Amino acid sequence: MIPGEILTDDGEHELNAGRPTLTVVVANTGDRPVQVGSHYHFFEANDALSFDRAAARGFRLNIAAGTAVRFEPGQTRTVELVELAGDRAVYGFQGKVMGPL
């Protein structure tokens, strides 16, 4: 085993099984690419991204940990979000929540 190596079983692994999800259409209205990481509170993503922010409160991208989605300028794409777990308190990011959801 190599330090940091992750060993998994063969086959497919379902991420976030049974957790509430939400599908949103996102448009990058800015002139620069925007990248959002797997555990970023999507509600607080870059203001150049146009989407239903109220619906996205308490959600993050439903993608593998450590990955990200890139939105090119002028691009519109549909993404799936998954509800935040744990104590459902959000601190940092853009400072729009700073406490329990």
UniProtKB/Swiss-Prot annotation:
GO terms for molecular function: urease activity. It is found in: Cytoplasm. Its EC number is 3.5.1.5. One of its GO terms (cellular component) is urease complex. It catalyses: urea + 2 H2O + H(+) = hydrogencarbonate + 2 NH4(+). Pfam families: Urease_beta. GO terms for biological process: urea catabolic process. Pathway: Nitrogen metabolism; urea degradation; CO(2) and NH(3) from urea (urease route): step 1/1. It is an enzyme of class 3 (hydrolase). The keyword Hydrolase applies. Keywords: Cytoplasm, Hydrolase. It comes from the Bacteria. InterPro entries: Urease_beta-like, Urease_betasu_sf, Urease_subunit. SUPFAM superfamilies: Urease, beta-subunit. NCBIfam families: PRK13203.1, urease_beta. Belongs to the urease beta subunit family. Heterotrimer of UreA (gamma), UreB (beta) and UreC (alpha) subunits. Three heterotrimers associate to form the active enzyme. This is Urease subunit beta.
